[in-house]
Amino acid sequence: FQFAAFCGSFRAHGRTWWTRLPWGWGGSDMGPREFNNTNAAIPAGDRRNILETEMNNPAIEPVVRKYDELRYQLMPYTYTSAREARDSGLPLMRALWVHYPEDPQARALGDEFLWGRDLLIAPVYAKGATSRDVYLPKGEWYDWWTRERSSGGKRVRRVVDLSTMPIYVRAGSIIPLDAVRQYTSQPVADPTTLQIFRGADGQYTLYDDDGISQAYLTGKGTWIRMTWTDKSRQLTIEPGAPTGATNVVG
């Protein structure tokens, strides 16, 4: 599920057919329990106990909620990246070599990727892992969860658990964050917040439209250009400043 939150198609359900809850992956060592009509031999009482267990998983549910909410908070960033994909052909999920073609290590990697331009995602794919090595390309990078700053051009070892998939942000990035919502069109009162990660100058162009119609095909959308000057800690926004807060990291 952690990895799914950074895929173009957000697969937000488990495999247990009964409930399809995101954490419905069963608890046996054999993997997910696939209940179907051939399970008629399971007594009805046991089936009820299984159902209740799947619906109440205090160890997993908070993790699912955390990444689900992050997916929605990053919607302005992801939506802008989707528009970029439509206009340029650049995918949402990008191999590191797309933006670091001269880096031989970036060209060789297949187990981490960029989400849009500025977020580096390193899924944990080894069962029971408590850490994983993450390669950071040239430049300065911030750990999304701790805000710890690291220099790139090398590997760093990141402690991991179920709730902490390694995510890094490129220095100079301007990341728009929305309020948590239950679905994409749900109105929210809180404004969009801009998270700025210091250490380099940066530029970002935020895109938005009505999110419903095909009007974007005829140019009905809004582009807001932003420029961050790191030395003077100055953010310039044009043509129309969005209503919201700005947080500077670093």
Where are these regions (language model features)?
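Accessory, solvent-exposed terminal regions and/or long lumenal/extracellular loops of proteins
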Residues: 164-250
